């Protein structure tokens, strides 16, 4: 019976994904999705500039089969074949755009992302990866390199490939999301195990390569209180295992995702910013030497993490979260607003209700 349910579930996810993928538009295959430079924090806690390059690829193999319930990054992928030459051209375009600024910097880092895994040969061919690594190695002021990958692609061959060219700090971002396997599978549909994650962390250590743990704050099907506890416990576990940094990702409702399906039915609400503050404070207090970050994409919007919608504290807290990421000073998170009482009441009512609640405004209608 369980197998029948699982098969039907996967088929539903795949059809939902395919329906939205038909809306993708053909874009220039020789230009990246985006490229920008910003202030960032290095692994040694110093502040510098990072160049972020988001490559356009054919997308995450796992997402094509249905994928994670909150994700629609596959929509940024190309509906057409992307070759190694295309990816090399995208990288060169990004470097050329910022080469003059890079020359003037004492040091800088480069972050190279895709809509999936940089270490998946189907998405980024080895030829393109090696070209990128070789070109990066030519910068005397390069301090760090960051890429992303699912853990199943982190192996001896790929790590040797990296170290063949790069002797700087390297981090591989892994979407661990939660260290609770039941939550990761049923509420996220991640398709990876704790065993795979631990193996990737240990393997990377052998090459002095860090693992940056992406942790999702408030996946589907759990309450606000459960989300707070899960994020704190997951971060503590990742730090215990030796992850080089923790990057919290407050859930944002992506168009075309399963999360949006429940959001539209008012059966899901993105996390409160008060919850995020509590998570960051607790994790940093317990692990003062750990590097803790928080993504603020979507923060303050209706589809992103927010307190009372349109409350003035949303903008303030977003700024404080960004400052915390750069300074690692939990004192900047000391914020107060009357709407905090609504958050406390929401958690209390939701716990009595047992099942997760939706938007508090719609609940009062």
UniProtKB/Swiss-Prot annotation:
Residues 45-289 form the Radical SAM core domain. Pfam families: Radical_SAM (PF04055). SMART domains: Elp3 (SM00729). Keywords: 4Fe-4S, Iron, Iron-sulfur, Metal-binding, S-adenosyl-L-methionine. InterPro entries: ELP3, Elp3/MiaA/NifB-like_rSAM, RaSEA, rSAM. Signal peptide: none annotated. One of its GO terms (molecular function) is metal ion binding. It comes from the Archaea. One of its GO terms (biological process) is tRNA wobble base 5-methoxycarbonylmethyl-2-thiouridinylation. [4Fe-4S] cluster binds at residues 60, 68, 71. Its cofactor is [4Fe-4S] cluster. SUPFAM superfamilies: Radical SAM enzymes. One of its GO terms (cellular component) is cytoplasm. This is Uncharacterized protein MJ0550. It comes from Methanocaldococcus jannaschii (strain ATCC 43067 / DSM 2661 / JAL-1 / JCM 10045 / NBRC 100440). The lineage of its organism: Archaea, Methanobacteriati, Methanobacteriota, Methanomada group, Methanococci.
């Amino acid at each position: 019976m369980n197998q029948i349910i699982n098969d039907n579930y996967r088929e539903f996810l795949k059809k939902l994904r395919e329906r939205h993928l038909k809306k993708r538009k053909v874009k220039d295959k020789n230009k990246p999705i985006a490229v920008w430079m910003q202030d960032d924090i290095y692994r040694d806690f110093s502040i510098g500039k990072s160049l972020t390059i988001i490559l356009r690829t054919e997308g995450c193999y796992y997402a094509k089969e249905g994928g994670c319930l909150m994700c629609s990054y596959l929509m940024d992928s190309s509906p057409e074949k992307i070759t190694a030459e295309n990816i090399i051209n995208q990288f060169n375009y990004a470097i050329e755009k910022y080469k003059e600024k890079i020359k003037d910097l004492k040091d800088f880092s480069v972050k190279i992302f895709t809509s999936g895994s940089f270490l998946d040969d189907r998405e980024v061919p080895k030829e393109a990866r090696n070209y990128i690594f070789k070109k990066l190695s030519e910068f005397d002021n390069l301090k760090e390199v960051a890429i992303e990958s699912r853990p199943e692609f982190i192996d001896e061959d790929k790590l040797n490939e990296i170290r063949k060219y790069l002797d700087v700090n390297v981090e591989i971002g892994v979407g661990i999301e939660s260290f609770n396997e039941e939550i990761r599978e049923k509420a996220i549909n991640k398709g990876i195990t704790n065993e795979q994650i631990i193996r990737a962390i240990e393997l990377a250590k052998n090459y002095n390569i860090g693992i940056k743990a992406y942790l999702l704050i408030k996946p589907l099907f759990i309450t606000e209180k459960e989300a707070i506890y899960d994020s704190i416990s997951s971060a503590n576990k990742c730090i215990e295992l030796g992850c080089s940094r923790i990057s919290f990702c407050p859930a944002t409702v992506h168009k075309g995702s399963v999360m949006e399906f429940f959001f539209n039915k008012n059966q899901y609400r993105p996390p409160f910013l008060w919850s995020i503050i509590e998570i960051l404070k607790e994790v940093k207090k317990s692990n003062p030497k750990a590097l803790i970050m928080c993504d603020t994409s979507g923060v303050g919007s209706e589809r992103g993490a927010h307190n009372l919608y349109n409350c003035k504290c949303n903008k303030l807290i977003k700024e404080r979260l960004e400052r915390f990421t750069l300074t690692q000073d939990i004192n900047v998170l000391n914020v107060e607003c009357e709407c905090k009482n609504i958050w406390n009441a929401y958690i209390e009512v939701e716990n009595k209700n047992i099942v997760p609640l939706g938007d508090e405004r719609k609940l009062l209608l």
